[in-house]
Amino acid sequence: MELRQLVKEVPYLMETRGNMSVEIAALCSNSREKTENGIFFCFAGAHFDAHQYAPQAVQNGCVALVVERFLDDVNVPQVLVSNGRAAMARICEAFFDHPERKMRFVGITGTKGKTTTSYMVKSICEQAGFKCGLVGTTGNMIGEKHIPSSKTTPDPIDLMRDLNEMVQAGVQVVAMEVSAHALDMHRLDGMTFECGCYTNLSQDHLDYFGTMENYFQCKKAFFTSGMAKNAAINADDERAAELLRDVTIPHMTYGIAAEADLFARDIEITENGVSFELRLRNAEYIQINLRMTGMFNVYNALSAAACALILGVSPENVRAGLESIRSVPGRIEMLPTNTPYRVILDYAHAPDALSNILRTCRTFTKKRLIALFGCGGDRDKGKRPIMGRIGGELADLCILTSDNPRTEDPMEILREIEEGIKETTGEYVVIENRRDAIRHALEIGREGDIIVLCGKGHETYQETMGVKRPFDEKVVVQELLTELRGE
């Protein structure tokens, strides 16, 4: 595709230099990659400025640049834009012939519940006869085909490449997790969502957004900027009233405590699942028997149901889709251990999520509730003592250990968590090495105990000092049990 054709729809275009007829055959955001006839995107980030790597990108095959300032030391065509990230999204869409215009999109945003809700939306829409795709934290899916991804919402190059593959595979509906980072970084600029879903807002990502207000405003923009055509909104969330006041698009509310268009009644929670009546304001209702437990999964089911109903899916297909889903990777996932105690894997890595999983497990714990968790490095430090306090209040024993320390000192992170747990009477131990911590949990587990491994969930790595090393807790648990049994 000619460069001029590629950039003609970019609203951020200011000026061009050089031969705009040059053919572009690839997209590049990593100057170290060999990219023949590629276009390299330059913009200033939080930690580096890609403009300084433009010569390396050209040396590796790029024949054009998108820049936020002209570079005099690089002799290739340059496209000057006012916002490099936003321009990147639009150019990626054009390069792949606009896959975002060829499918229906459901975007789920919120601090918690995005992954499970997206899986539920996919399941419901498949029951309705649609071929579905999924984009999210656990990776992307085309039907049952899994495509690994390192971000909740991928960068535009990867996102549009995967969406184009979905189009080629005949996908009709895509359930997508929409992170606040993706919104703020313009990764989704140019996309339109038939339905946007707001799940909730609680403390997370303050290392990036600074304040909860900034975090909320970023989420709200998804519903007020024209990106979403319809909205499904959790009426029970404390920021719902403010969101509803400013949202002008058609919307459906859902909830349990608050008055809502879609709500759950007669909720019964067991260790094996949840049953409830899903009711509409017109008095129509359907009985739902989820095979996933926890009150938070009632909310996830409500959010998915609201999205599906907005898409025009029948209540019966909503029921069938919700009841057919057994589990979501790393979300209150019961591991097969063949032990007198149970081991549960969960992605909980923020205060509310930790509270939810521990409260849920407490309802069906016969003996002790043992919580193993840490906090990620280079992320919101304010939540560390809060999570320590939550663990100390809700678990019988906390095992504090490393999550993904990244570039921070693991013991310093643990000391900050410890500050919170010391405010409680909860029993705890500190074992920095996560594998050793899991071994300790398995060694002390007794009949009737529940051990909850929090924080990693579906992840198959641990990041320490900037290096990601293989660490799949499902595998680690099985390896340790084999060792402990002397097999």
Locate the predicted segments by residue:
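A short acidic, helix-capping loop that chelates divalent metal ions and anchors anionic groups
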Residues: V74, M141-H146, Q203-F209, R379, ...
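ATP-dependent carboxylate-amine ligase
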Residues: M1-L13, E36-I39, A283, A306-E316, ...
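Acidic, Mg2+-coordinating active-site environments of NTP-dependent enzymes
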Residues: E9, E68-N75, A169, D184, ...
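Phosphate-binding loop of NTP-binding sites
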Residues: M88-A235, R239-V247, L302, L311, ...
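Short internal beta-strands
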Residues: Q59, V63-R69, A231-A235, L372-F373, ...
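N-terminal leader/targeting and accessory segments in enzymes
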Residues: M1-R90, A94, E238, A260-E268, ...
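Short, well-ordered alpha-helix to beta-strand connector turns
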Residues: I24, E36-N37, C62, N75-V76, ...
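Short secondary-structure boundary segments
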Residues: V67-F70, V178, N200, A235, ...
